[in-house]
Amino acid sequence: MRHHEWVPLDEIVRKAKMPEKDVLYRLKRLNKFGFVVRSTYGYAVSMGGYDALAINAFVKKGILKAIGNKLGVGKEGDVYTVLLSDGREAVLKFHKHGRTCFTRGKRYRGYLADKHHISWLYVSRLTAEREFEILNELFPIVKVPEPIEWNRHAIIMGKVVGEELKRLDLSEFMSKEEIKDLFWKIIEEVKKAYEIGYIHGDLSEFNILLDENGDFVIIDWPQAVPKYHPDAEFYLKRDIWNVIRYFKKYKIDKEDEKIDVDKIFEYITK
């Protein structure tokens, strides 16, 4: 999978160390259930099959007990509620990258820059691994989901509660002073992440979740870049601007001259 989208039958037979007729029988059944797909070039694991492999690995490790409802479908994956073997509720995120995401990834993500002839499933695995590693470095200092386990293209994270800022009208339940306080709390988390060594790189109202108690969590970190990245200033200033842009509709910037991209950039990086 790392080197092919389609694996030739003879290679599968060689790896399986089984008679060809037995391999074909099993491949036919896997294809029937949608776990593999077939073409004139060979066979490939389907996204559903890759999901099943990751789920099976979590179950065999004694981590996962049950999968619940789908919470949503994001730009880069599907998210489900899950029940862990220790009784905790958590979140299961499957990274799923098509050709468009991969093209974007090769252009912007350093950890994919030297990967050329690899499958889309392997790209999904790399991004999941990358996000898990970053969350491990940020949690619990930064308000991010707790990383629990990773396998293939899937990550199990601590339960996340809240709504995207995009879906909320903060003025309905917060005063202007509380809204301004929330803005600066988000900036503080951006600063903490920077001090650890990372810039989110795609921060916006779509990946900041706010709960009913006014607490928040920042999600979606696979595209994060190190603070020593050649384009670090561009990404950090873009993140800052995206947060300012969202809060501008509440006019908090009119009363606080510190709410400025360059001033906040200097504050974060000093």
UniProtKB/Swiss-Prot annotation:
Alphabetical UniProt keywords: ATP-binding, Kinase, Magnesium, Metal-binding, Nucleotide-binding, Serine/threonine-protein kinase, Transferase
Oligomer status and interactors: Monomer.
Annotated ranges, domain Protein kinase: 65-270
Binding positions for ATP per the UniProt entry: 72-77, 93, 158-164, 206-207, 220
Biological process annotations from GO: maturation of SSU-rRNA
A Pfam family matched in the record: Rio2_N
Enzyme Commission designation: 2.7.11.1
Descriptive protein name: RIO-type serine/threonine-protein kinase Rio2
Keyword Transport: no
Cofactor(s) recorded in Swiss-Prot or TrEMBL: Mg(2+)
Catalytic activity: L-seryl-[protein] + ATP = O-phospho-L-seryl-[protein] + ADP + H(+); L-threonyl-[protein] + ATP = O-phospho-L-threonyl-[protein] + ADP + H(+)
Record-level Gene Ontology MF annotations: ATP binding; metal ion binding; protein kinase activity; protein serine kinase activity; protein serine/threonine kinase activity
Organism: Methanocaldococcus jannaschii (strain ATCC 43067 / DSM 2661 / JAL-1 / JCM 10045 / NBRC 100440) (Methanococcus jannaschii)
SUPFAM superfamilies documented for this protein: Protein kinase-like (PK-like), Winged helix' DNA-binding domain
Binding sites annotated in the UniProt record for Mg(2+) 2: 207, 220
